């Protein structure tokens, strides 16, 4: 197999073979779209039990004209990188097989996001391969770049957790928050979060026009947020009438005085040089604060804030496309870092305006 760890100019010229396991869903389709336009990746296999034998373009319209076809996931060819876009529980059961055929595994499910078996017992239904948990690296280069470089197992973050963590991280990194402060997180997310299979609550007649609390407490992404920021949060999630997007409004109550200058210093210090984070903090015009519509189809995250001195509160906003920055785009970005490729390769699209409901 090709060595996927070269750096510099050679890395930008090399071809990296890749398979996508579970490529028939929405996230799998986004991943295939990105890899098909990537200057380095060569897709050799796309699997789906339910769609085996069908052309990829018949399921994912952006890939019409591609000669790729879905295959059964049982007999896989050796590749440099294996992307797993499967439901929770699949990757942990097949992780040994994945590493038999690939040097690097990028898992987009929840199977390796948490650090300990005890966390999976608490938040999920246990874990079949706990020995891999300490080997996995969380797929957010903005705050985990050093550890992702050369990583063999990459764990994609949850979309709601990604939006929340990117919004709050600078406050901890720059000492505005130290842990223990009250943080209330309110996330609104589009219907694509439920996947292509959906369900009764995701059907158009039931979903259209809603602002529906579906996880007032106990959302599993809360575990990721608390793990990464090392603090507790009060987290609530709403299903809303859009297809793409996750918007997090974070109400933060710091223990000491904070100025707008402090906030700008923190956020610029963390994100000024990041290619996929842009600030939207007040100003003028229609798009004054982060919103999913402005980043639909991109790997961008928008972050902004307002200070509420009378209530001793900071309101932090963050917005992403849940299928891109919250999943497929994040996975490709992390893979670029792990393999020493150009970070922005395959992810340069900056969005459209105007657009309809994302």
Please state what every model-predicted region is.
Residues 213-217, 238-241, 291-295:
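Short Gly/Pro-enriched turn/cap motifs at secondary-structure boundaries
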Residues 26, 135, 159-166, 216-224, ...:
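Conserved active-site and cofactor/substrate-binding residues in soluble primary-metabolism enzymes
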Residues 36-40, 173-177, 219, 227-231, ...:
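Generic secondary-structure signature for well-ordered alpha-helical cores
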Residues 1-207, 212-214, 306-309, 344-358:
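N-terminal Rossmann-like NAD(P) cofactor-binding subdomain of oxidoreductases
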Residues 151, 245-249, 313-315:
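Short, solvent-exposed beta-strand edge segments and adjacent coil->beta transition regions
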Residues 251-358:
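C-terminal active-site/capping subdomain that shapes the small-molecule cofactor and substrate pocket
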Residues 218-243, 247-249:
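Oxyanion-binding "anion nests"
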Residues 30, 34, 166-170, 224-228, ...:
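Alpha-helical scaffold segments in soluble metabolic enzymes
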């Amino acid at each position: 197999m090709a060595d996927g760890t070269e750096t510099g100019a050679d890395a930008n010229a090399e071809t990296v073979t890749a398979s996508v396991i579970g490529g028939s869903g929405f996230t799998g389709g986004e991943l295939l779209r990105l890899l098909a336009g990537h200057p380095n990746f060569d897709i050799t296999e796309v699997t789906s039990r339910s769609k085996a034998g069908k052309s990829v373009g018949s399921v994912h319209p952006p890939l019409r004209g591609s000669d790729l076809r879905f295959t059964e996931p049982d007999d896989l060819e050796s590749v440099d990188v294996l992307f797993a876009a499967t439901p929770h529980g699949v990757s942990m059961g097949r992780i040994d097989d994945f590493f038999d055929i690939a040097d690097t595994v990028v898992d987009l499910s929840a199977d390796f996001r948490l650090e300990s078996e005890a966390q999976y017992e608490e938040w999920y239904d246990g874990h079949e391969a706990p020995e891999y948990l300490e080997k996995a690296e969380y797929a957010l280069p903005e705050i985990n770049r050093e550890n992702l470089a050369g990583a063999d197992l990459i764990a994609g973050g949850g979309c709601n957790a990604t939006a929340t963590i990117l919004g709050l991280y600078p406050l901890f990194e720059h000492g505005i928050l130290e842990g223990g402060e009250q943080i209330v997180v309110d996330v609104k997310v589009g219907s694509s979060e439920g996947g292509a299979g959906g369900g009764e609550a995701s059907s158009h007649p039931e979903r259209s026009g809603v602002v529906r609390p579906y996880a007032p407490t106990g959302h599993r992404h809360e575990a990721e947020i608390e793990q990464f920021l090392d603090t507790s949060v009060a987290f609530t999630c709403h299903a809303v009438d859009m297809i793409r997007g996750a918007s997090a409004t974070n109400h933060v109550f710091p223990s000491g005085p904070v100025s707008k200058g402090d906030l700008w210093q923190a956020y610029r210090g963390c994100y000024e040089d990041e290619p996929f984070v842009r600030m939207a903090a007040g100003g003028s015009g229609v798009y004054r604060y982060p919103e999913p519509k402005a980043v639909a189809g991109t790997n961008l995250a928008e972050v902004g804030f307002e200070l509420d001195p009378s209530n001793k509160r900071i309101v932090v906003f963050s917005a992403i496309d849940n299928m891109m920055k919250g999943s497929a785009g994040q996975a490709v970005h992390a893979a670029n870092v792990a393999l020493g490729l150009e970070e922005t390769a395959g992810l340069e699209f900056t969005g459209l305006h105007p657009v309809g409901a994302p």
